[in-house]
Amino acid sequence: RELLASIDRRTTVGRRDYAILLMLARLGLRSSEVVFLELDDIDWDAGQLSVHTKGGQRIELPLPADVGEAIAAYLQHGRPKSASRRVFLRARAGITGFRGPSSLGCVVRRALQRASIDAPTTGAHQFRYGLATQMLSHGASLTEIGEVLGHRHPQTTMIYTRVDIKALRALALPWPGGVR
């Protein structure tokens, strides 16, 4: 929340970065899925996105209102004119889509620096992990989390179930006679 609140949405780059970061946080998309998203992949009438996944599949995802509004604000008031069909474009000369997924890591790092957030990891994948962790803590099943993240195999989703020792300590009952 702090990160998103720190973005200056009055600027072209701010509108773009806000929409990108919101997509990462709310939908748990991979960097490549955001980078290669094209204008025709957004069905505004149905309120959904058609996403090309890592495994070459195409999945339909609901477009949350806040994400849709952020994308629309960028498209209407920030996206430079370009022949590129990619939704998100670089802001520098030679206006094209991002070169690849690692470019979003730069967007995330810059946003973290501007917000003065010292994060242990600074890549775009932290948003995906954060969404999975949040879903898990709210009682979602591994199957549900896997569906949202586009995992084909349950083993892949298991990566997101790492034990949070601090959280467990806060929930644990004290051992009789022991110190907490």
Give the location of each predicted region.
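Conserved catalytic core of the tyrosine transesterase superfamily
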Residues: 1-180
